[in-house]
Amino acid sequence: SPDSNAKTVNCESYDGTSWSEENNVITGVSWMTGFGTQTAAMIVGGTTGSGVLVNNSQTWNGTSWTEGNNLLVATEGNQGAGTVTAGLSGGGLAPSALLTSQTYDGTSWTEVNDLNSAHGYAGCFGIQTSAVMCGSSTPGRQSTTETYDGTSWTETTNFATARYGRSES
């Protein structure tokens, strides 16, 4: 019987009208984060199934995937923002919710100031020096919202209603 924990390696791109099959990712994972553009993107972290967390990073150049340097902490449900030369990964689960934040300079990951609240499977958008992280599903729904200025996280006005679930831009 098929492995219910098997992860797909398929990759597709969208041109504004239709989807096209692209070269496969190197390692199939789920619950990872991603950031970048259609021709320069990165996926980091995630799980290969059966509770196995990874710290892999894979970079897309518009044609193919290459293995990048690993995150400092294996995690799933982390949030990301930025570009392949100025990326940000924060929060996630390993296995409990994390405060950890890391930045990427195109070559390596560096630990930076922690989040004020642990966020797993939250929403995140922006760039490495100006990002917003909000909500969470772990532990429970949260209304917390934080902004990142390239140095530290600051709690800002909370959502009126606690939220959970992922969103990336």
Model-based region annotation:
Residues S1-S169:
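Polar, enzyme-active/binding microenvironments
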